[in-house]
């Protein structure tokens, strides 16, 4: 459904905002109508999350901050979104709240109204035609809102839960199973029967489905394979070349681990799931180091919810826990690179990656001082790019909002200041 866009121009204020940004003073807050990137290179999304919902009385609140290389900048009142992501593409900066989708450029901010409220965001994707897809989860379904280049906002619901999501060209695809997504089970079992010769049908199937460009609320099945006990991942991105999806995954050593038997469910090894969408087939490739040994994973070293990028044949990524790896997507040759641990138990460090290295935005927690670090993939020591206490007043929140958190951040396209 096409939605009317309300364009908020900021021509009269642009010069004033740029002076404020370059003066090196405190970060100041303005309305969303007054926000534009200016000369900033980092954009930060701040919001309160589920802690604001548990009491039922707290006010939802959120901000969008545009920061310069020295940590100065401007903050706009952008509203709340749990799991809020932000995407900076050549088209501009896109982000959202439960009710609205925003596009901020140097010309101003445009607001689009959602068809239905979206309380929890998973990820944003830029398509080859510069459309932007935002993925949400709510009550047993995942919805994609697509912001078209023609000024439209359309929504497509997908029945089921899809625990691994990513982009493959102009499509958003997900790797799930028939237990979590029962609506796709009939098509999944039919597809498996058509490609299998043994006549045996597994109880549960692993399935790749397409969440965009389809009719109805049941996503079409692209590939199927028997579900493997203890094989998990939990990602919102993966490698995709042509029609081949490759996703680093965790294979549990003890798939039957439980409190009763005392086995550790967090102990396992890294493998690659490779799904060829042109044939509908899956291949599992063990990830090994230079000596042929398995890349071991555990509670302290994880791959869950990584930020990744492909450089040549190598997929480089850092998990939400701060553990960095590099894996050849064809051979499975892998290496552990380094870890960037968070110094706060209550506030996570968030990451972005480029071909050269990792950017880590750390909220220190106790005083809400924020630091941007950069560390190259090649193992050099990380270095500090800036530290600012000016975001603290927004992160600390108010009595009716509780504390807020940095949900995500993004870099201006082409900017790689940490590598300079």
Model-predicted regions and their roles:
Residues 164-346:
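Acidic, serine/threonine- and glycine-rich low-complexity intrinsically disordered segments
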């Amino acid at each position: 459904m096409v939605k009317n866009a309300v364009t908020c121009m900021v021509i009269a204020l642009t010069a004033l905002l740029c002076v404020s940004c370059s003066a090196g003073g405190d970060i100041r807050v303005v309305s969303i109508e007054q926000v534009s990137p200016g000369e900033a290179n980092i954009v930060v999304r701040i919001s309160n999350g589920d802690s604001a919902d548990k009491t039922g009385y707290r006010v939802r609140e959120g901000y969008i901050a545009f920061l310069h290389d020295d940590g100065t900048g401007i903050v706009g009142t952008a509203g709340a979104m749990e799991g809020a992501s932000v995407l900076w593409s050549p088209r501009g900066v896109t982000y959202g709240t439960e009710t609205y989708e925003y596009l901020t450029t140097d010309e101003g901010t445009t607001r689009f109204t959602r068809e239905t409220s979206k309380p929890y965001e998973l990820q944003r994707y830029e398509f080859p035609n510069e459309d932007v897809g935002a993925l949400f989860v709510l009550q047993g379904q995942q919805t994609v809102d697509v912001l078209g280049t023609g000024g439209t906002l359309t929504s497509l619901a997908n029945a089921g839960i899809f625990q691994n999501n990513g982009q493959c060209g102009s499509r958003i695809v997900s790797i799930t199973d028939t237990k979590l997504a029962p609506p796709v089970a009939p098509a999944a079992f039919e597809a498996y029967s058509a490609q299998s010769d043994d006549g045996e049908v597994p109880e549960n199937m692993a399935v790749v489905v397409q969440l965009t460009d389809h009719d109805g609320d049941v996503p079409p099945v692209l590939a199927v394979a028997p579900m493997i006990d203890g094989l998990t991942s939990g990602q919102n991105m993966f490698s995709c070349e042509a029609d081949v999806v490759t996703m680093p995954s965790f294979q549990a050593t003890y798939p039957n681990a439980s409190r009763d038997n005392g086995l550790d469910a967090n102990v396992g090894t890294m493998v690659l799931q490779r799904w060829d969408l042109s044939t509908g087939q899956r291949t599992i490739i063990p990830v090994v180091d230079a000596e042929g040994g398995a890349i071991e994973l555990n509670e302290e070293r994880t791959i869950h919810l990584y930020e990744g990028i492909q450089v040549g044949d190598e997929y480089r990524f850092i998990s939400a826990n701060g553990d960095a790896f590099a894996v050849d997507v064809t051979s499975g040759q892998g290496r552990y690179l380094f870890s960037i641990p968070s110094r706060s138990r209550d506030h996570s460090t968030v990451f972005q990656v480029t071909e050269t290295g990792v950017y880590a935005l750390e909220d220190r927690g106790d005083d809400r001082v924020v630091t941007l670090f950069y560390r190259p993939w090649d193992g050099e020591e990380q270095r500090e790019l800036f530290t600012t206490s000016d975001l603290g007043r927004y992160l600390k929140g108010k009595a009716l909002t509780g504390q807020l958190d940095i949900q995500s951040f993004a870099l201006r396209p082409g900017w790689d200041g940490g590598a300079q």
